Amino acid sequence: MKGQRLLFLLYFATCVCAQPFASDAVPDSVWQDSITGIRTHLQHVDSLAPYKCPLHLFGKKADGTPKQPALQAMIENIGINALVLGWDHYVQHREWTEITSKVLERNLTGAWVWDNDSFSGNQFAHPYHGSMFYNAAREHGLSYGVSLIYPIVGSSTWELFCETNPPAINDFLSTGIGGAALGEITHRTSDIFFDNTKTGAQRVAREIIGTFLNPVRGLHRIISGEMFRINRLHAGKKEKPEPYTFQIGAGDRYIHDIGTFHPHTQQRYHQHVPYLDFRFTYGNHYNNLDEGKATRAYDYFDLYALVNLSPDNPTIGELDIRGRIGSIQHQLPRRWKLDIGLYQNIRYIDHYGKDGQHAGNLAIISEAARFG
């Protein structure tokens, strides 16, 4: 036992004493284990500083940050649209992807409209699409304010060049504004899961969940190889860790409507809908008062999601997000606290059955862009 303990101490000492080195052939520092000889690439990312993108289309500066990050992010925006359009055209065979020169001329010169496409497509898929534009900018170290431009530009190019349908105002708002909100939330939430110090099954699970939340960052990690490297010194975080709480619940809703007949059974609408619901709170609501920190965009937000487990109902039944953009806080007498701030809200409720039948008289509503 003593021998094993001594061996462990010697191994630990050699690992601690081993020094990272740099060379012209390997621009990033490399950690070399003095016993095994295994080299681990280190990015030396300070968790308190903006993250340095591992991809460098135009080379990188001496500090490791990419040259032309804004241009590189814009190129990725074009690539995202091309990838989504290719999927819809070649795999889904969507009719609205048959783009011609006449369609482009009409889109560029004609008036914008308010379309009436599918509820889930307009109110959920578009913000999710916009979040990828936004995260392409955040992935390159651009700030929250600058990154807001990218879903707006990405949405505009999609409406003008990627659909046979006339450009739609509501799609532009859902993708541009709703996408920015969803993008910052997935940017921060995925950062909780991605951790380069983890190994084994936990690392695999973290990579899968993080990539599902933030596909752009997951793709960056795959291309750069960061997804498959273990880093003993740095977790690869982009944001300073904030406190968070997570709750999960399960239940069953019984829907019965005496005024609606099911289209197939011709009976009054009634069904059991099992579900899972999730509540996630990120950050400290009163961080300015409690910790003396200046509030930053989305350093505090609430998220509620309901996932239906019934094959007859949409998978995403509800999504409610409230994120703080900025606020002024005051301490009042008797431990009362006052927060006067600007908040962005996203609300999505869909209780239509997959057969198109409304599940009773439960409301469907979406607010992809709301401030208050």
Predicted regions and their residues:
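Bacterial N-terminal signal peptides
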Residues: L7-V16
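Outer-membrane beta-barrel translocator/channel fold
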Residues: P166, N170, R188-G200, Q344-G360
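N-terminal targeting leaders of membrane proteins
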Residues: A18-F124, G130, Y134, R138-H140, ...
